[in-house]
Structures are given as C-alpha cells and as structure tokens.
Amino acid sequence: MQNTIRIVGIDPGLRRTGWGIIDTLGNSLRFVASGTVTSDGDMDLASRLCQLHDGLAEVVHTYKPDEAAVEQTFVNKDAVATLKLGQARGIAMLVPARAGLRVSEYAPNAVKKAVIGVGHGEKHQIHMMLKILMPKVEFKGDDAADALAIAICHAHNRGSNRMREALAG
C-alpha cells in the first residue's frame, strides 16, 4: 500500500523565494498550498538571508513535507547577482535539510519538461499546465508557480532518483 508523500518545491531567489506544497499518491497530485517568502531589499545581505531562512522554516514547520526539491541556479553575466542567488539557494537547501528532509535538485529545463513536456517553455504554459494537473491550484505570481512546478518535477522523478542513488551505492 502506498503512502501519500508531501513535497515542498522551492524556487530560490534573494528578493522572492517561491514555495509550493503538493501531496502525491502514485500518479495523482493534489495542491496543498503555495506562496513566496520575501526579503527586504533595504537590509544588508545577512539580514535578508535570515528573512528567507525564517520564512522557509515556517513553511516547513507548518506543512511538514516529507521531501524537498530545489531548482538549480544558472550562471549569468552578473557575477555578484549570481553569488547572491547562490547564497539564497543555500538557504533554500539548508532549511529542509536541517528539518531532516531529503533535498533533490532539478535544472530549470528538467522542471519545464516534467510539467509541459518540453524543456524550453514559457511561464504561461507552466501556469496553464498547473491548472490542468491540479484543478484546485492557487498561486500568486511566477515564483510560487515555479515552485509548484519544481514539486511536480520531483513527484515525477523521485522513483528514478531513488534508483540512481541505490545503483550508485
């Protein structure tokens, strides 16, 4: 008998970190909640990272997910922005890991492929597919929608991830 698995998907960002919670049982997906954690751009970097940490910790405490998935970041031309995004991503991985969750990582094109079938889709396509896959879905903004897509990607790939880990030793 299968158990329901609760997954938190996290779309890291220094200004806004999106989060989405879904329940999965076999192939079925059920929307639970979504939102964003924001940091105050007028504060210093350490304080902003603390805001992200505290906000995500509250999400994990409230919804008690079983597993976590975080989107991998890309390197862009602005090295400082890339480093700051990497620090926010570190918080996004640390919070669920400290709560004892297994944290998986997915490239943006893998997330899009899992949700819309191709690796290079548009935001509106993701929004539309979220509504098809989970008719009761609610999200405010792209960050929360992306986080839900990350959670769905993990739901579709969690079995293959376990197989890879088992084969790796």
Curated annotation (Swiss-Prot):
Homodimer which binds Holliday junction (HJ) DNA. The HJ becomes 2-fold symmetrical on binding to RuvC with unstacked arms; it has a different conformation from HJ DNA in complex with RuvA. In the full resolvosome a probable DNA-RuvA(4)-RuvB(12)-RuvC(2) complex forms which resolves the HJ. Belongs to the RuvC family. It comes from the Bacteria. This is Crossover junction endodeoxyribonuclease RuvC. It catalyses: Endonucleolytic cleavage at a junction such as a reciprocal single-stranded crossover between two homologous DNA duplexes (Holliday junction). It comes from Rhizobium leguminosarum bv. trifolii (strain WSM2304). Its EC number is 3.1.21.10. One of its GO terms (molecular function) is magnesium ion binding. GO terms for cellular component: cytoplasm; Holliday junction resolvase complex. Its main location: cytoplasm.
